[in-house]
Amino acid sequence: KIQFLRGFFSLFVFMFLASPVQAQTEGSLNLITSPLPISLTAEPGTSISTDLKIKNGGLRDEELKITIMKFRAYESSGKPQLMEREDGDIFFDWVRFSEPTFTVAPNEWKTVTATFDIPKEASFGYYYALVFSRAEEEKPQEERQTALVGGTAVLVLLEARVPEAKRQVEVAEF
């Protein structure tokens, strides 16, 4: 009887204290980026480059693309809010990539260079979100199905430092 209770207790401990294992499905997109975030400073009329590193943590080769968005901070939390290009957002045109699309194998790191060609009329700050996602998203196989489409973003703050520019902040109320 004691042997039975020990066995039962051991089984109980094993079943309830063992951590669950989550399997990654073959179709899962698992990307890791570095560095986060990136802060660049350059003078108008020059170019500046930075390396973007991405790792495929998935189980299969992934063909990826880089798209450009912009970001701002949510008012209450300060977390980034990604936004699409709007009319007048010409700073999107300043960015080029060494490889806008590429393939990365499982567990492999890939480095892509982003170059910002800053025009002479640029000034102050520009907020980019460089988004890595699948080049061709998988579409649902059957009718009335939905799919979650996503990626991961590297946030880039580009400061165009104008030598004669004057920065001034006024506190209206405290």
Label for each model-derived stretch:
Residues 23-51, 57-60, 137-174:
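Long, low-complexity ectodomains and other extracytoplasmic segments of secretory-pathway proteins
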Residues 1-9:
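Bacterial N-terminal signal peptides that target proteins for export
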Residues 43-44, 106, 122-124:
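Surface-exposed loops/turns
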Residues 8-18:
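Bacterial N-terminal signal peptides
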Residues 2, 21-23:
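Intrinsically disordered, low-complexity regions enriched in polar/acidic and amide residues
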Residues 25-35, 59-114:
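Surface-exposed binding patches on compact interaction domains or structured appendages
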Residues 60-83, 117-163:
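Terminal connector regions
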Residues 53, 112-120:
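Short, hydrophobic beta-strand segments
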